[in-house]
């Protein structure tokens, strides 16, 4: 996910494309883009790297791009889809055959040359649907899943990993760092995304080869970590501190964070934004844990015949689900019953939403809750309003941000999640139009943009958001909404 680096300024509208093509390490930054005059004809050519410089090529994905291009009448939308959908494959996937003769895939986030369990699982997710059409793509996906399982077994508390034991920028963090780790921020969702990816791969392909001893050991480590972070036996083994100017990059109370009461929920030291939680029972991530444990149980039962592990996964999922019903809901004076963002079990709660996924807004997208759930519908109205302290609205657009980038910065990811979870065509159309109008004429999505000027943005190369945009457009096409897309002016 995102990481704080020294701000750098990027140039005119081809800067993003040029740097993407060269895979330059200059992307290891976050910066606001100054205003510029964009060359009108820029949208006539795609901004993908040259074919010879693309890291991974899938014929099935290329065929799908052509199919969708032919259906889209809006030239800019077709151009953006062409740039964004393959961005993970073009620029971040490092596929190889390991020393054991098996596929191994290391996936950069984009400008940061490390592999986040969350980002990598989300980045390759929309390609799973093509696995049966492309043997090399299928191998690449096996490589991602295998790498993720190995990472979990190296350290189930880490969020991001290096390509080998090479150390990195955060080795001085006051936690149990290892040279294989890029960062060791404990985030519940880091253990959920690999299960989600493996489950979807299994459902699409029927391939059970990935569910080996490494998989079983990873599930054991996930269960151990989740249980420890229920805090029933004290604070557990994990603590984290960093010498930093950013308060949300470290934990309070000597690295343990704010206290929680053991009520069955799982504590998460950090959010999917990599920011520290205020109250450690992070509600969207606990919902994600429930659905992930149930998926793991289904695999373990059907493939591994691990009866005891199946029972453990189901029991923990049930326990967390009961606790969510009791502690996650708040009776808001304006919106009625809504889900809180964070709670501590003592009765304290934080009412907000952050753009990063899992979020309250994104819960139906992840399959954690039904979009027509009454409490979710109330929550959705709340988070997309100025009653959410991290909802911003300006001349360029509106959406949810978060403390990671700060005031007045809207994350396109939140706009995408509004579209993904919407049951209203006008709302979907408005979201797509907003995304098209806030790309700063680069043809790519960015981490965030300033509410009054999309040419001021952070992270020119953020593969997850790019691929997620492509995933959204493809879903709308496949859902029969091509007329809606073609009606956008």
What are these model-derived regions, one by one?
Residues 2-13:
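Bacterial N-terminal signal peptides that target proteins for export
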Residues 11-22:
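Bacterial N-terminal signal peptides
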Residues 29-118, 143:
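Low-complexity, Ser/Thr/Pro/Gly-enriched N-terminal "stalk/linker" regions
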Residues 60-73, 122-135, 193-208, 287-306, ...:
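Well-ordered alpha-helical scaffold segments within catalytic/enzyme domains
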Residues 80, 135-151, 208-227, 296, ...:
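Extended, well-ordered alpha-helical scaffold segments
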Residues 113-141, 145-248, 462-477:
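Aromatic-rich carbohydrate-recognition surfaces in CAZymes
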Residues 117, 153-157, 161-164, 170, ...:
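Extended ligand-binding clefts on enzyme/binding-domain cores
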Residues 173-179, 184-187, 350-370, 408-489:
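C-terminal capping/lid segments that line or modulate ligand- or cofactor-binding pockets
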């Amino acid at each position: 996910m995102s990481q704080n680096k020294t701000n750098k300024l990027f140039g005119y509208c081809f800067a993003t494309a040029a740097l993407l093509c060269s895979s330059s390490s200059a992307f290891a930054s976050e910066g606001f883009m100054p205003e510029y005059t964009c060359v009108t004809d820029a949208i006539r050519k795609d901004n993908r790297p040259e074919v010879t410089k693309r890291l991974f090529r899938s014929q099935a994905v290329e065929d799908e791009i052509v199919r969708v291009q032919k259906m889209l009448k809006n030239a800019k939308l077709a151009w953006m889809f062409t740039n964004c959908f393959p961005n993970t494959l073009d620029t971040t996937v490092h596929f190889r055959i390991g020393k054991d003769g098996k596929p191994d895939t290391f996936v950069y986030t984009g400008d940061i040359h490390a592999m986040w369990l969350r980002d990598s699982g989300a980045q390759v997710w929309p390609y799973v649907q093509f696995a049966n059409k492309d043997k090399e793509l299928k191998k690449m996906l096996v490589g991602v899943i295998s790498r993720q399982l190995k990472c979990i077994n190296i350290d189930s508390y880490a969020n991001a990993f290096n390509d080998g034991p090479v150390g990195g920028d955060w080795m001085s963090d006051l936690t149990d760092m290892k040279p294989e780790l890029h960062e060791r921020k404990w985030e519940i969702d880091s253990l959920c995304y690999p299960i989600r990816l493996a489950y979807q791969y299994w459902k699409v392909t029927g391939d059970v080869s990935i569910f080996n001893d490494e998989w079983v050991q990873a599930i054991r480590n996930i269960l151990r970590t989740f249980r420890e972070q229920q805090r029933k036996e004290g604070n557990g083994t994990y603590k984290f501190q960093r010498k930093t100017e950013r308060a949300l990059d470290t934990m309070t109370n000597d690295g343990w964070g704010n206290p929680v009461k053991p009520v069955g929920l799982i504590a998460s030291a950090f959010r999917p934004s990599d920011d520290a939680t205020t109250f450690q029972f992070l509600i969207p991530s606990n919902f994600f844990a429930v659905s992930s444990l149930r998926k793991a149980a289904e695999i373990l039962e059907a493939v591994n015949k691990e009866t005891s592990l199946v029972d453990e996964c189901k029991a923990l999922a049930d326990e967390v689900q009961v606790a969510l019903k009791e502690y996650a809901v708040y009776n808001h004076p304006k919106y009625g019953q809504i889900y809180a963002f964070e709670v501590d079990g003592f009765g304290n709660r934080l009412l907000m939403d952050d753009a990063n996924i899992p979020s309250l807004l994104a819960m139906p997208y992840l399959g954690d809750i039904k979009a027509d759930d009454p409490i979710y519908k109330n929550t959705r109205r709340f988070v997309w309003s100025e009653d959410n302290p991290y909802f911003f609205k300006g001349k360029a657009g509106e959406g949810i941000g978060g403390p990671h980038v700060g005031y007045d910065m809207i994350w396109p990811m939140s706009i995408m999640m509004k579209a993904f979870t919407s049951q209203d065509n006008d709302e979907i159309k408005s979201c797509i139009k907003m995304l098209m109008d806030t790309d700063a004429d680069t043809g790519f999505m960015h981490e965030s943009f300033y509410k009054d000027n999309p040419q001021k943005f952070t992270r020119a190369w953020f593969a997850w958001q790019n691929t997620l945009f492509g995933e959204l457009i493809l879903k709308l096409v496949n859902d029969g909404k091509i007329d809606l897309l073609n009606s956008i002016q």
